[in-house]
């Protein structure tokens, strides 16, 4: 199946502790149906001291289920579903079903 959410997309969280927050997708993990989103689903990690870093408690993003995310509409930033269409020049692109705007390309 084609990827509806890709790295670099602006997404909105639909459910959970961070409902309504938005951010950029840093990484998609297709085998687990999860994604890392900047500034969303932050957890505290206890960091061991290394040569480059000192010890302490660090906040970092944890993976979130793809079903809990929706792509933000390029026009108004609200959550939208994603569709696919083929342009006249033969390229297959994703578009926002809410506004009809092309997401990539």
From Swiss-Prot:
The keyword Ribonucleoprotein applies. Belongs to the universal ribosomal protein uL24 family. InterPro entries: KOW, Rib_uL2_dom2, Ribosomal_uL24, Ribosomal_uL24_CS, Ribosomal_uL24_KOW, Translation_prot_SH3-like_sf. PANTHER family: MITOCHONDRIAL RIBOSOMAL PROTEIN L24 (PTHR12903). This is Large ribosomal subunit protein uL24. GO terms for cellular component: ribonucleoprotein complex; ribosome. SMART domains: KOW. Coiled coil: none annotated. The keyword Amino-acid biosynthesis does not apply. Part of the 50S ribosomal subunit. CDD domains: KOW_RPL26. GO terms for biological process: translation. One of two assembly initiator proteins, it binds directly to the 5'-end of the 23S rRNA, where it nucleates assembly of the 50S subunit. One of the proteins that surrounds the polypeptide exit tunnel on the outside of the subunit. HAMAP family: Ribosomal_uL24_B. One of its GO terms (molecular function) is structural constituent of ribosome. It comes from Methylocella silvestris (strain DSM 15510 / CIP 108128 / LMG 27833 / NCIMB 13906 / BL2). It comes from the Bacteria. Pfam families: KOW, ribosomal_L24. The lineage of its organism: Bacteria, Pseudomonadati, Pseudomonadota, Alphaproteobacteria, Hyphomicrobiales.
């Amino acid at each position: 199946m084609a990827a509806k959410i890709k790295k670099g997309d602006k997404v909105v969280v639909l459910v959970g502790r961070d409902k309504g927050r938005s951010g950029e997708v840093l990484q998609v993990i297709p085998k687990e149906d999860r994604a890392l989103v900047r500034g969303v689903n932050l957890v505290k990690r206890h960091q061991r001291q290394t040569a480059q870093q000192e010890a302490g408690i660090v906040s970092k993003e944890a993976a979130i289920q793809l079903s809990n995310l929706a792509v933000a509409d390029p026009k108004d930033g609200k959550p939208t579903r994603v569709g696919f269409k083929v342009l006249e020049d033969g390229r297959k692109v994703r578009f926002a079903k809410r506004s009809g705007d092309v997401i990539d390309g």
